[in-house]
C-alpha cells in the first residue's frame, strides 16, 4: 500500500548517550543525600498521574522531606524464532500492519532474531515546594522508530513535569489507558489498543485516589492513503494542515475491584490544494473517538485487562493502524472528483494476567482492529489486524523475570482477499534496577 504522510511525528526522537550521562552527573551534584538501593520490581509504570494541589500544611510537611531523585530502568534480552516474515525494520515485534500485503513481499519465511531494544533508562524527580510537589520524569528506551526504525538507539518516551493540577510535556495521552497493557514480553502490544505518548498540556481538576477527571490539548498529526490515485500529478501539491490542537479527556472511576475509564477525543484535519489546475482537492475531516477500558480483579490476584474503542480518523492514536484519511470517489463532481474521508475503526482488547504465586505468572488474550476502508483505497490496503499471545514467566526475585511466549498476528487486505499471518516463539530475560537519591 502506498501512503502519503501528512504529519505523523513519532513519539520521541533519538537522544545522544552523552546527554543522558550529563543529566545523571548533574543530578548527582544537585540532589543532596545518601544513595540507597531499592528493589525495582516489575516494569516501572507510566509517568506520574496528575494530583490536586495540596493544602498548605501538607505542602510544608513535604518540603521538610527534601528533594528526591529516582534513577530506574532495566536491561532486557529478547530472542526468538519467526516462522513467517514481516517488514525487516520491525523484525522483533508483532505488528499486523507490517505483515506482507502480497505473497513473499519480504522474502522467504523463517527468521531468528535477538536484541536488547526494550532496555530502558529513566529519571524521576520530586521537589517539595510551598505550592506543592514538582514531579518530573525523563525516560528513554533503545527501540528505534521513524527514521531509526529497526535500529538500537535512544528514543524519548517521557519528558514530563507537573505541579498540582497542571502537567506539561510528553507522556501518555488522556485518550489512552496504560493499565490495559498486559504483562507480556512482546514489545509492541495489542493491535486494537489506544496507545500513544504525545506532547500535551493537561489539566486535572479532580482526583481522589486513582479516580480522576483530566482534559488535555495535544499535538495534532495524521496520515493519508492516496490509494488508487497515488502518483497523480493533481495530488502532488496537496498539503496537510492542522489549525487546532487535538482535544482529549478522560474520566476514571477506581474501586477495590479495579477501575473503569471512559475517554474521548476530537480533532480537526485539513488539506490544501496548492495546484492551479482545473481541480480543487482541498478539504477537511473531523476525527473523533470514544475509548472504554477497564481492569477487573479476579480472585484478588488475577487481572482482566479490557478495552473497546470506536471512532474515525484516530488511527495515529492506535497502537497499530495505518492511515487516518482515505480517498473517496466523487466522480459526479468534475471540479472535485475525489474527497478525503476520515476512516472509521473499531478496536478490541481482552487479556487476562494470571499471578499464580510470587514466582510464576502467565498472560493470555486476544486483540483486533477493523478499518472501514474508503472506496478509493487500493485493493491491498490494510483492512483488519488480529493479535494474540500466551506466556509463562518466572521471577527468581521481584526484580528479575525470564520465560517463553508464543505470539501470533494476522493481516487481512481490503478487497483482493489476501491474508498473511505471523507466528513466533520468543524467550526474554529482564533485569530491573532502581536507585533513590536524596529525600529523608
Language-model region placement:
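Outer-membrane beta-barrel proteins
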Residues: 82-86, 147-149, 177-181, 222-227, ...
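Detector for outer-membrane/organellar transmembrane beta-barrel domains
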Residues: 254-382, 439-440
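Extracytoplasmic loops and strand-loop junctions of Gram-negative outer membrane beta-barrel proteins
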Residues: 54-57, 101-108, 183-187, 230-235, ...
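Outer-membrane beta-barrel "beta-signal"
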Residues: 396, 420-440
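Transmembrane beta-strand segments that form the barrel wall of outer-membrane beta-barrel proteins
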Residues: 133-144, 219, 263-268, 361-374, ...
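Cleavable N-terminal export/targeting peptides
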Residues: 1-57, 437-440
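Outer membrane beta-barrel
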Residues: 58-226, 241-259, 295-299, 303-316
Amino acid at each position: 500500500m502506498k501512503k502519503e504522510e501528512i504529519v505523523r511525528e513519532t513519539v520521541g526522537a533519538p537522544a545522544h548517550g552523552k546527554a543522558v550521562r550529563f543529566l545523571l552527573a548533574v543530578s548527582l551534584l544537585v540532589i543532596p543525600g545518601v544513595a540507597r538501593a531499592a528493589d525495582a520490581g516489575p516494569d516501572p509504570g507510566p509517568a506520574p498521574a496528575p494530583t490536586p494541589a495540596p493544602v498548605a500544611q501538607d505542602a510544608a510537611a513535604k518540603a521538610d522531606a527534601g528533594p528526591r531523585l529516582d534513577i530506574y530502568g532495566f536491561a532486557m534480552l529478547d530472542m526468538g524464532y519467526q516462522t513467517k516474515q514481516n517488514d525487516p525494520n520491525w523484525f522483533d515485534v508483532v505488528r499486523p500492519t507490517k505483515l506482507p500485503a502480497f505473497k513473499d513481499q519480504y522474502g522467504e519465511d523463517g527468521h531468528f532474531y535477538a536484541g536488547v531494544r526494550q532496555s530502558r533508562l529513566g529519571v524521576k524527580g520530586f521537589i517539595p515546594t510551598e505550592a506543592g510537589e514538582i514531579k518530573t520524569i525523563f525516560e528513554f528506551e533503545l527501540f528505534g522508530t521513524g527514521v531509526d526504525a529497526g535500529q538500537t538507539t535512544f528514543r524519548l518516551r517521557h519528558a514530563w513535569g507537573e505541579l498540582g493540577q497542571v502537567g506539561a510535556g510528553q507522556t501518555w495521552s488522556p485518550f489512552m489507558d496504560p493499565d490495559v497493557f498486559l504483562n507480556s514480553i512482546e514489545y509492541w502490544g495489542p493491535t486494537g489498543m489506544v496507545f500513544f505518548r504525545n506532547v500535551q498540556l493537561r489539566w486535572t481538576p479532580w482526583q481522589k485516589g486513582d479516580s480522576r477527571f483530566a482534559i488535555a490539548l495535544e499535538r495534532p498529526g495524521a496520515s493519508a492513503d492516496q490509494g488508487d490515485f497515488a502518483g497523480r500529478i493533481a495530488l502532488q501539491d496537496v498539503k496537510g494542515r492542522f489549525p487546532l490542537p487535538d482535544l482529549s479527556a478522560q474520566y476514571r472511576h477506581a474501586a477495590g475491584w479495579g477501575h473503569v475509564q471512559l475517554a474521548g477525543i476530537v480533532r480537526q484535519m485539513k488539506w490544501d490544494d496548492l495546484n492551479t489546475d482545473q481541480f480543487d482537492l482541498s478539504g477537511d475531516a473531523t476525527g473523533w473517538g470514544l475509548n472504554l477500558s477497564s481492569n477487573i480483579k479476579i480472585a484478588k490476584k488475577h487481572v482482566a485487562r479490557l478495552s473497546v474503542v470506536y471512532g474515525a480518523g484516530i488511527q495515529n492514536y492506535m497502537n497499530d493502524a495505518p492511515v487516518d484519511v482515505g480517498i473517496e470517489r466523487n466522480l459526479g463532481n468534475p471540479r472535485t472528483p475525489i474527497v478525503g474521508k476520515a476512516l472509521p475503526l473499531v478496536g478490541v482488547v481482552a487479556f487476562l494476567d494470571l499471578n499464580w504465586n510470587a514466582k510464576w505468572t502467565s498472560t493470555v488474550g486476544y486483540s483486533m482492529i477493523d478499518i472501514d476502508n474508503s472506496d478509493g483505497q487500493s485493493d491491498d490496503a490494510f483492512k483488519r489486524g488480529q493479535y494474540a499471545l500466551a506466556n509463562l514467566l518466572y521471577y527468581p526475585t521481584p526484580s528479575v523475570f525470564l520465560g517463553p511466549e508464543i505470539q501470533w498476528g494476522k493481516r487481512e487486505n481490503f478487497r483482493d482477499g489476501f491474508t498473511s499471518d505471523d507466528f513466533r516463539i520468543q524467550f526474554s530475560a529482564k533485569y530491573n534496577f532502581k536507585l533513590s537519591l536524596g529525600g529523608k
